[in-house]
From Swiss-Prot:
Organism name: Leptospira interrogans serogroup Icterohaemorrhagiae serovar Lai (strain 56601)
Origin: domain of life: Bacteria
Binding residues for substrate: 31, 45, 57, 141
Subunit text: Homohexamer.
Gene3D superfamilies, per the entry: Inorganic pyrophosphatase
Name this polypeptide is given: Inorganic pyrophosphatase
Metal-binding in keyword set: yes
EC number: 3.6.1.1
Function: Catalyzes the hydrolysis of inorganic pyrophosphate (PPi) forming two phosphate ions.
An annotated GO BP: phosphate-containing compound metabolic process
Protein residues bound to Mg(2+) 1: 67, 72, 104
Length: 178
């Protein structure tokens, strides 16, 4: 069985275009994640509030971050992408975030094969209200769990690509090939 985190390439055009593994489709209240040991999708929890995910949400394979998880990615598309869908995603920015005091950046990307969004090259091209929606969702979705999330800022594609490269490098150091 292929493990979505360890056995799938981050993509041969990274950091500009990466592979993303979707865990949660846009519009869902269920928080799914790939089980680190078994590589299958598990229900982490149903969101405590009436919020729903504003974008397709997942991770970049063979990436690793300080929170001991793969690097998160939000993939914008005109369609809801099913959990465990592999999607080529053009990196356009990053939302810098602290979750309970721990760094938890979210890469913002567009589906490379979706003509309704693949012309977007940088987060600055998104409608300002969309980034406000993302900020609001991530600041508020854990409040009823008594957890604190702080959105520091949104940054451009250049910084986002550096964060992608750093996470791929950390993965290689943390999980050396046998």
């Amino acid at each position: 069985m292929v493990h979505p985190w360890h056995d799938i390439s981050p993509g041969d055009q990274n950091p500009e275009i990466v592979n993303g593994v979707i865990e949660i489709k846009r519009g869902s209240r269920a928080k799914y994640e790939v089980d680190k040991e078994y590589g299958i999708l598990k229900l982490d929890r149903v969101l405590y509030s009436s919020f729903y995910y504003p974008a397709n949400y997942g991770f970049i394979p063979q990436s690793y971050c300080g929170d001991q998880d793969p690097l998160d990615i939000l993939v914008l598309s005109q369609v809801e992408l099913e959990p465990l869908c592999l999607v080529k995603a053009k990196v356009i920015g990053v939302m810098r975030m602290l979750d309970s005091g721990e760094e938890d950046d979210k890469i913002i990307a567009v589906a490379a094969n979706d003509m309704s969004v693949n012309h977007i090259n940088d987060i600055s091209e998104l409608p300002p209200h969309f980034t406000l929606e993302l900020k609001h969702f991530f600041e508020d979705y854990k409040k009823l769990e008594n957890k604190t999330v702080v959105i520091e800022e949104f940054q451009n594609a250049i910084l986002a690509r550096k964060i992608v490269l750093d996470s791929l490098e950390l993965y290689k150091k943390t999980f050396p090939k046998k």
